[in-house]
């Protein structure tokens, strides 16, 4: 601000000197004005003074409605300013036929008005995340947004009148479009602020706030996308490819597509929340921390995710509007593909279904724990097998020794007879250990014989790998021994040479 004051003072002094010289040398008003408008030095000084006046007015508006800017607001202002200047330069190349002093003044005014809009959006975000905001700040931000809306409407009406008066494509299309975008952004920011105030008056208990905010942003992106497309077509038909609109058009389309995808995913997840996420029992609430980490309040009733964490149903619904992962462990919450997906245990892949009757309580307790590296390899192999139509999956490596040799039974006592009898199926086939994981893929059950063949082949592969490692170690040992013998021989020869 001090540098602006100094620059403004020097600019005002230079302009006053030029005006005094023009009137003192010409002595009449009309010749003096002709001299000021035709002299290049005087013309540049007058333009500079006009720009300084606009900057001073911008500083006064900012100080009146916002006060001192925060560091985040200054950073946002600097980042957006450079991008906007580059886009304005591209726009100037498109409308070079309409280039004039008034066009430069309108462009400078547009940049300053856009900067005020960026600050307003950032200040509203700051107010929404601040616990206690004084009433003066609320009054200033409301009056500031109303002031911006009035300015947008005035510039928009001026551009539309110019466009209607000329009845042809001109630079007025550019300013009409820009101020229309700014006006819709101001309305969206103001409505979002109203949502915040309503939630604050309800002491943070307005459950529909996130839903309404999401719909507001969706409608705002749709309106902006429609305006960008219309303006792109209008400029393309009359002037050529508008390079300054390509980035904005792409970003708006990407944001709109992401919001549509989030909305569809949210509807899929919340359409059957009662069936997909069961209610937590009293024992589960007592066994775990009964505090919802979303709202930090005690839970009397809660929903249980597949990962085992508990949340309020309304907190979970509001969380799913923005995120699709567990708030605690960040495990993904995917929408159900069919009715059976909701009942699938955690950690089992869609193409791999567990055998009925083999589920144990230990598997439920281990659902929230981190899986080991070998189990991750097993799940990856099972998924690959299901994708390629295989009917088998490799068991964990810690079960290979258990299945590498068939169970042996003796007739030394009755217990041995019972064990041998219990290890046979009704058809006379030996069954595997109940703790061993059995997999289904595409409805086909892998037999015990196939499992044993896979186990034996994998065991042989391990044995071959170990043998090759042993051979390499033996070769390295021999080379080391040979090197040690050679060094000892060289040392002895050196000692004999010294003694001789």
From Swiss-Prot:
GO terms for molecular function: ubiquitin protein ligase activity; zinc ion binding. It is an enzyme of class 2 (transferase). Its EC number is 2.3.2.27. GO terms for cellular component: endomembrane system; endoplasmic reticulum membrane. Residues 337-375, 398-438 are annotated as: Disordered. It catalyses: S-ubiquitinyl-[E2 ubiquitin-conjugating enzyme]-L-cysteine + [acceptor protein]-L-lysine = [E2 ubiquitin-conjugating enzyme]-L-cysteine + N(6)-ubiquitinyl-[acceptor protein]-L-lysine. Keywords: Endoplasmic reticulum, Membrane, Metal-binding, Transferase, Transmembrane, Transmembrane helix, Ubl conjugation pathway, Zinc, Zinc-finger. It is a multi-pass membrane protein. It comes from the Eukaryota. GO terms for biological process: ERAD pathway; proteasome-mediated ubiquitin-dependent protein catabolic process; protein ubiquitination. Its main location: endoplasmic reticulum. PROSITE patterns: ZF_RING_2. Residues 398-426 have a biased composition (Polar residues). The keyword Zinc-finger applies. A zinc finger (RING-type) spans 292-330. It is found in: Endoplasmic reticulum membrane. Pathway: Protein modification; protein ubiquitination. Residues 1-3, 62-98, 157-170, 247-500 are cytoplasmic. Residues 25-40, 120-135, 192-225 are lumenal. Probable component of the HRD1 ubiquitin ligase complex that mediates the rapid degradation of misfolded endoplasmic reticulum (ER) proteins, a process called ER-associated degradation (ERAD). Belongs to the HRD1 family. This is ERAD-associated E3 ubiquitin-protein ligase HRD1. The gene is HRD1.
């Amino acid at each position: 601000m001090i540098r602006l004051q100094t620059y403004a003072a020097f600019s005002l002094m230079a302009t006053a000197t030029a005006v005094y010289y023009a009137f003192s040398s010409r002595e009449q008003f009309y010749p003096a004005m002709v001299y000021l408008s035709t002299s290049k030095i005087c013309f540049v000084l007058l333009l500079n003074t006009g720009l300084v006046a606009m900057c001073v007015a911008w500083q006064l508006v900012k100080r009146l409605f916002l006060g001192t800017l925060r560091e985040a607001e200054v950073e946002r202002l600097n980042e957006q300013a450079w991008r906007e200047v580059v886009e304005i330069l591209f726009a100037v190349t498109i409308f070079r036929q309409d280039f004039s002093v008034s066009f430069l003044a309108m462009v400078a005014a547009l940049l300053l008005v856009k900067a005020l809009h960026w600050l307003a959006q950032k200040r509203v975000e700051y107010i929404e995340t601040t616990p206690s905001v004084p009433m003066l700040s609320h009054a200033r931000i409301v009056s500031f947004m109303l002031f911006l809306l009035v300015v947008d409407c005035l510039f928009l009406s001026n551009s539309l009148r110019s466009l209607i008066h000329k009845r042809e494509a001109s630079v007025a299309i550019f300013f009409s479009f820009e101020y229309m975008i700014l006006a819709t952004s101001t309305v969206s920011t103001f409505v979002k602020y109203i949502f915040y105030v309503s939630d604050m008056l309800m002491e943070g208990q307005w459950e529909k706030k996130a839903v309404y905010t999401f719909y507001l942003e969706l409608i705002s992106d749709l309106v902006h996308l429609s305006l960008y497309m219309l303006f792109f077509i209008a400029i393309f038909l009359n002037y050529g490819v508008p390079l300054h609109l390509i980035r904005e058009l792409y970003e708006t389309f990407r944001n709109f597509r992401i919001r549509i995808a989030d909305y569809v995913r949210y509807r899929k997840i919340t359409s059957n929340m009662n069936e997909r996420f069961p209610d937590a029992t009293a024992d589960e609430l007592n066994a775990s921390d009964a505090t919802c980490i979303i709202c930090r309040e005690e839970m009397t009733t809660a929903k249980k995710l597949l990962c085992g964490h508990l949340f309020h149903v309304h907190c979970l619904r509001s969380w799913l509007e923005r995120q699709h992962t567990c708030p605690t462990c960040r495990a993904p919450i995917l929408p159900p593909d069919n009715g059976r997906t909701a009942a699938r245990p955690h950690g089992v892949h869609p193409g791999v279904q567990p055998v009925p009757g083999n589920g144990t309580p230990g598997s439920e307790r281990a659902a929230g724990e981190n899986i080991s590296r070998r189990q991750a390899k097993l799940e990856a192999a099972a998924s690959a097998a299901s994708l390629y139509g295989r009917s088998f999956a490799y068991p964990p490596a810690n079960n290979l020794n258990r299945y590498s040799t068939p169970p042996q039974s003796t007739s030394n006592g009755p217990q041995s007879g019972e064990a041998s009898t219990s290890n046979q199926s009704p058809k006379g086939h030996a069954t595997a250990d109940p703790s061993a994981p059995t997999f289904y893929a595409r409805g086909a059950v892998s037999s015990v014989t196939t499992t044993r063949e896979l186990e034996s082949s994998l065991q042989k592969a391990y044995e071959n790998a170990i043998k090759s490692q042993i051979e390499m170690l033996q070769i390295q040992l021999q080379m080391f021994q040979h090197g040690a013998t050679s060094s000892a021989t060289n040392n002895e020869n050196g000692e004999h040479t010294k003694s001789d």
